[in-house]
Amino acid sequence: MLDVAEVYENYTLVSTNHLQEFISFNEPYIESVTGHYACAVSALLACGAYYNAVDYTDIAGDYMDIWDSTGTTVSSESGGITYGSTTIGNIGPGFVDFCAGKNVSVTQNTDYSPNYNFFTNCIDRGDIAVVHCGIISSDTGERAGHSMAVEGYATLRAYNSGNTVHTLMVFDGWGDTVRYLNFDFDSWTDISGSAFNG
């Protein structure tokens, strides 16, 4: 994952597009207002904000509504915070249900082996998506998954090698600034996507 400074220092932009406003809810804030955290729920909260389905006076209520609508289950508890895990197949449909409860009409398409255009087409039509990535944890030797809101894309060319890199501009669920996810990274165990249309 690349941050903005790294991108502009080491790459030139070949093509890019992104939503007009970058939406994020950092993990410490979410934990402080909800006592809970799940990456998919945080990603969907950003998606909900994009479609004007989030009540900023009740972030905690909306977060827990998304938690419930996606069937997110408790994976662990630590330091008074409840952490959750969400099945990929529940993420898109659960978000559609959450939005319907807010009288916002959104459809979804989940792809378990998306190509790069799955995400670029979504952004180009003015919508938002969620990417789900799997990788083998160096700590446990087991698959670890993470879901992030996709708010743009950038095809980059490295200054030193001339290699082209396809990236997704994501809210990583942890911080407040855009990160560039390398879609071409060869150590992903799996990549899935949920694209919305609203």
Residue spans of the language-model regions?
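Active-site-adjacent structural segments surrounding the nucleophilic cysteine of cysteine proteases
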Residues: 1-85, 167
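Intrinsically disordered, low-complexity N-terminal regions enriched in serine/proline/glycine
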Residues: 7-10, 28, 62, 82, ...
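Feature targets compositionally biased, intrinsically disordered low-complexity regions
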Residues: 34, 60, 70, 78-79, ...
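Predominantly the structural core of cysteine protease catalytic domains
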Residues: 37, 45-46, 74-156
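Secondary-structure boundary/capping signal
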Residues: 55-56, 103-107, 158, 178
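Active-site signature of cysteine proteases
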Residues: 115-117, 133-198
